[in-house]
């Protein structure tokens, strides 16, 4: 959908554009990542935002709010803004971190209650790796899903979140 909204030819171009846009890249950088110049970058950004008016409103509101030096995060805390162009990224990255931390809290509560044999071995961005006894894999998988639903509710989110789990003996099998 983002590829179509931006009018880009390939999924790779769209993915690179989206990340550059969300990280606050300006027209020159956006033009460069899609094989063009600043004019192309400006046209692409304008087209994308005209096709996604709510995103434009969010970006404009967050950029304006960032002029105070902070913005309000998903859980109410204040996030410090280093630069207005990075304000949307700060909000989104902050939300992701808050969701993942709350999700881990809810998983821990449920794991203790269920008596599941599990150890956290890695936390990478929005992914957790656990060592789980074979007998508990399916039950633990359901705990992770239920904890994410509870996280959505705890944080008062209007958009439901979901997650998936994979079982394997190596990180490669579970990633």
What do the PLM-derived regions correspond to, one by one?
Residues 1-175:
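Conserved catalytic core of nucleotide polymerization and phosphodiester-bond processing enzymes
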């Amino acid at each position: 959908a983002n590829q179509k909204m931006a009018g880009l030819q390939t999924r790779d171009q769209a993915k690179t554009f989206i990340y550059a846009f969300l990280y606050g890249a300006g027209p020159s950088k956006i033009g460069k990542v899609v094989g063009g110049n600043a004019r192309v970058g400006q046209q692409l950004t304008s087209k994308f935002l005209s096709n996604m008016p709510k995103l434009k409103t969010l970006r404009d509101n967050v950029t304006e709010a960032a002029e105070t030096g902070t913005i309000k995060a998903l859980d109410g805390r204040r996030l410090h803004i280093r630069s207005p162009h990075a304000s949307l990224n700060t909000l989104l990255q902050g939300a992701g971190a808050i969701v993942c931390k709350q999700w881990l809290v809810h998983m821990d509560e449920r794991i203790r209650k269920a008596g599941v044999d599990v150890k956290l071995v890695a936390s990478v961005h929005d992914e957790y790796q656990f060592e789980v006894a074979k007998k508990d894999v399916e039950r633990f998988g359901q705990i992770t899903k239920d904890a994410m639903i509870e996280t959505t509710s705890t944080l008062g989110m209007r958009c439901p979140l979901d997650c998936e789990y994979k079982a394997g003996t190596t990180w490669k099998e579970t990633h």
